[in-house]
Amino acid sequence: MKQELIERFTRYVKIDTQSNEDSHTVPTTPGQIEFGKLLVEELKEIGLTEVTMDDNGYVMATLPANTDKDVPVIGFLAHLDTATDFTGKNVKPQIHENFDGNAITLNEELNVVLTPEQFPELPSYKGHTIITTDGTTLLGADDKAGLTEIMVAMNYLIHNPQIKHGKIRVAFTPDEEIGRGPAHFDVEAFGASFAYTMDGGPLGGLEYESFNAAGAKLTFNGTNTHPGTAKNKMRNATKLAMEFNSYLPVEEAPEYTEGYEGFYHLLSLNGDVEQSKAYYIIRDFDRENFEARKHNVENIVKQMQEKYGRDAVVLEMNDQYYNMLEKIEPVREIVDIAYEAMKSLNIEPNIHPIRGGTDGSQLSYMGLPTPNIFTGGENYHGKFEYVSVDVMEKAVQVIIEIARRFEEQA
């Protein structure tokens, strides 16, 4: 199993599947189509049935039941795309067997070193086989680790028919990293009662609470004149953006928050005297606090419009997804079975809120309750990203055990 995980994963991450927020196609990049087509062929080779890829790049497949029991149809999902935060082109995965727990020089020429000082969890992987980047790209373990684990688990179940299970549906979705993963997902066609995303992090992660999320695009319009004669004439759009940001609570930002604390995050800012554009994300677990944060943004905009004119600040704000807890609680047994599956494999479940979102956040509100399970990755979205193959193997075992337990309890 370990070699299959390494072979598939290192092959998959070499395919550039970064999504693109500025694209209006579905999926947003051709690499995701290329990857989806490859997976269709490999799912067929494994022996899955009803393997499809629709015009929007969604891949679905079925592992038929091998029991006569009336078992609910369960699904396992992962996403095709990788993050946009750092380049994902020409990924060169580096395999470190029997890792010694010390610093790893990822790139000597660029002096990129993965150190325990910067990443304290690193020594806990001593003795593991870990896969890192070469220091010039992200790795793409988010979410090609989860995708690989689903492929390997399905292959294992097919070759081990003594493990009884109900019908299992598999889906690989595009554009999760830019919040569009479920946008064209056909829940009815998928046909599962509930599902699990394999899109978590370290060993034991079991998540069924996510942020409530919104995005706010702000356009600041200024008036540019010659600086030598600008008195009482110039309105500097960049300074308007700075002023807006100054009204937000300094301590309510990602770098100062954890656990159940929400935040405002300035994701990008660009422009000049004439016009500047800022993009914020707004996050909170509590729906009431979430709404209050959005109202705060609206109130700041209103105050600035009263001060500088209505055209000075233009706000576009949209909800992106909601806390899935509300939809998971009524079917709590799906969390309990995952919890029991981990315990039976001597994995200590680590239940904590997702300080982010998964496809499951939106799918849960579309009628498909979908908690999230660990994959073994660390330091996602950057050059220090790595994954433990040993933990990936545990994730595969969890998938298998969840399927087995649903059949056993039917």
UniProtKB/Swiss-Prot annotation:
Its EC number is 3.4.11.4. It is found in: Cytoplasm. GO terms for cellular component: cytosol. It comes from the Bacteria. The active site is at residues 81, 176. The keyword Metal-binding applies. Keywords: Aminopeptidase, Cytoplasm, Hydrolase, Metal-binding, Metalloprotease, Protease, Zinc. Belongs to the peptidase M20B family. This is Peptidase T. It comes from Bacillus cereus (strain AH187). The gene is pepT.
